[in-house]
Amino acid sequence: MTYLELLALLALQSVVTGATFPDETITEWSVNMYNHLRGTGEDENILFSPLSIALAMGMMELGAQGSTRKEIRHSMGYEGLKGGEEFSFLRDFSNMASAEENQYVMKLANSLFVQNGFHVNEEFLQMLKMYFNAEVNHVDFSQNVAVANSINKWVENYTNSLLKDLVSPEDFDGVTNLALINAVYFKGNWKSQFRPENTRTFSFTKDDESEVQIPMMYQQGEFYYGEFSDGSNEAGGIYQVLEIPYEGDEISMMLALSRQEVPLATLEPLLKAQLIEEWANSVKKQKVEVYLPRFTVEQEIDLKDILKALGVTEIFIKDANLTAMSDKKELFLSKAVHKSCIEVNEEGSEAAAASGMIAISRMAVLYPQVIVDHPFLYLIRNRKSGIILFMGRVMNPETMNTSGHDFEEL
């Protein structure tokens, strides 16, 4: 029996491009994945990269045929596209996102690790190179320690050493023949940076009303801001949306948070592709006081259960049709891992994926205050195309690494 190991890796923070592609296709799929993840852990932080997973699934689709390929296209929302159009989009996006003239750094790297002597169709290898610029490496999976070290070194190299130990020797054995690896790295600086000397310790109130102390950044400036109703017509039914651009204005981080007394779980069920588009079209540039936590999130997700819940099942069974990849029978996906990391600090973001109190008046002010001192959801998106590169939520900053600049305790 033959196994295909897919280890979809990501370390990242934001970016996308203006490729012509129905942005709601990827956005809807991103929202579906987010909703599944929040359903598996009510009080847990969430972090994943729709971009990284889309690239990994694109590589799988390239090797699939028949009902297996049809199932992947249906799950990803590609049915309205002509066959193969999605590959051209992913290629064009990758080329634009990683262009040297961009004011951010983004690396997209793909690699196919193949068992020595294992036959992979030449046409598949050519297409893999053309659409994903993928490397092909021949290894001996029976030497699992050496293979794991080789893959982890490759990942570290492409994520600026932010993501380590993606795989372990136990992930491979004598029947493993293929491993597909996808790595995404992003580093961007805020268009308007937070001054480190303004960072102070602040109380963050979790949904269970307990409090933790966190480093809170602060600045006053012009940002895209809007207030929206959750439809409840109650006093706490208004929530805030803030968009903070990175240098170059192509990429931004969008934050959504309810009023402090309203749990994030009240807002999350409203999340849809159309709502995100409404946020983007409705926020207006204005002066805002922003209090934003400095945080780091690293998360590893077993994609197998999530992809199955989203309708992708055939690639995980021995009847999978991956004959575009290899003539070998009983080739299927036995493992799918997604690892991501994001750091948000005073300068901006980097991904490969601090005590005292400050007094803030919540009384009438000259302009809006966005005080991110309770659970919130966030996404990093390309402002032109609307495509989401990174998505997540912060429920409990106590579990996250908040290291960074030293800050003053008040």
Curated annotation (Swiss-Prot):
Keyword Glycoprotein part of the UniProt annotation: yes
SMART domains xrefs: SERPIN
Localization terms from the record: Secreted; Cytoplasmic vesicle, Secretory vesicle lumen; Perikaryon
SUPFAM superfamilies linked: Serpins
Site (Reactive bond): R362, M363
Keyword list, A-Z: Cytoplasmic vesicle, Glycoprotein, Protease inhibitor, Proteoglycan, Secreted, Serine protease inhibitor, Signal
UniProt KW tRNA processing keyword: no
Function per UniProt: Serine protease inhibitor that inhibits plasminogen activators and plasmin but not thrombin. May be involved in the formation or reorganization of synaptic connections as well as for synaptic plasticity in the adult nervous system. May protect neurons from cell damage by tissue-type plasminogen activator.
The protein, known as: Neuroserpin
Gene giving rise to this polypeptide: Serpini1
